[in-house]
From Swiss-Prot:
PANTHER family according to UniProt: 50S RIBOSOMAL PROTEIN L33, CHLOROPLASTIC (PTHR43168), LARGE RIBOSOMAL SUBUNIT PROTEIN BL33C (PTHR43168:SF2)
GO cellular component, one term: cytoplasm
Lineage start: Bacteria, Bacillati, Actinomycetota, Actinomycetes, Mycobacteriales
GTP-binding is among the record's keywords: no
Protein name from the UniProt record: Large ribosomal subunit protein bL33B
A biological process from GO: translation
GO molecular function: structural constituent of ribosome
Top-level taxon in the UniProt lineage: Bacteria
């Protein structure tokens, strides 16, 4: 079972525009302590949008 202090936890990325949660990925907490933000394709909007880590 994954602990809450896992070094590489699973995170969900949500579109900044439509707020749909489109992607699940992993991140390294030691290298990226802040919230992750990537520009990815949103199938709901139909174009590339900024996706941000959700809690």
């Amino acid at each position: 079972m994954a602990s809450s202090t896992d070094v590489r936890p699973k995170i969900t990325l949500a579109c900044e525009v439509c707020k749909h949660r489109n992607y699940i990925t992993k991140k390294n907490r030691r290298n990226d302590p802040d919230r992750l933000e990537l520009k990815k394709y949103c199938p709901n909007c139909g174009k590339h949008q900024a996706h941000r880590e959700t809690r």
